[in-house]
Amino acid sequence: MSSPIVLALEHVSRSYPGGVTALDDVCLTIAAGDLLAIVGPSGSGKSTLLNIMGTLDLPTTGTVRIGGQDVAALSDRRLSALRGRQLGFVFQQFHLTDGLTAAENVATGLLYAGVPRKQRRLRAAEALARVGLAHRMRHQPHQLSGGEKQRVAIARALVHEPALVLADEPTGALDSANGAAVLALLLELHKENTTIAVITHDQDIAARLPRQVSMRDGRIEGSVRR
């Protein structure tokens, strides 16, 4: 039995004024449990694709479906709710809030989900334990290494149990040792059936993931499963 489709892009293009085409007829499906790399050089369209997958931008033409819903048919409010419920984001620069502990930063991922404060704290602690940081819950960002900050960011993306985690260059700001540790964590989360799309320019990272989607000039050049 095939896994349910989490996200589907159907003939998606994105153009900007001046005749710039960032995406050109992109078709892509991500099934539950997938761990894939979307890889390509600078200017290949990866960032635009990330924004459209994350519903932060809409295509000029084509259809984006998340959990079977056409996002273009949703009001801004319903789209925001879908994004907050179905998607988790991990960024290269972590985007943690200074002055908040690791647990408090993770709990912010539940602020708009109507989760009571006590439950937010409990779920934040569980998410941090899941990424190996149960012992750092009370530490603030300036007390954490780069690798630990990225683990906190991953915990924040996971805390509301999204259908899909979008990770934008998650090892890009890290040294090789911390980058390898974060990649190992993503592989471990994949074993737990977390669905993750990693956007990267790094061919070595892409080669270690079970599925690789290659982009160039706004188009998908190929898709390989290992």
Feature names for model-found ranges:
Residues 212-224:
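H-loop (His-switch) and adjacent beta-strand-loop-beta switch element
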Residues 73, 225-226:
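Short amphipathic beta-strand/extended segments with alternating polar/hydrophobic composition
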Residues 1-4, 226:
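Short, low-complexity, intrinsically disordered N-terminal peptides in bacterial proteins
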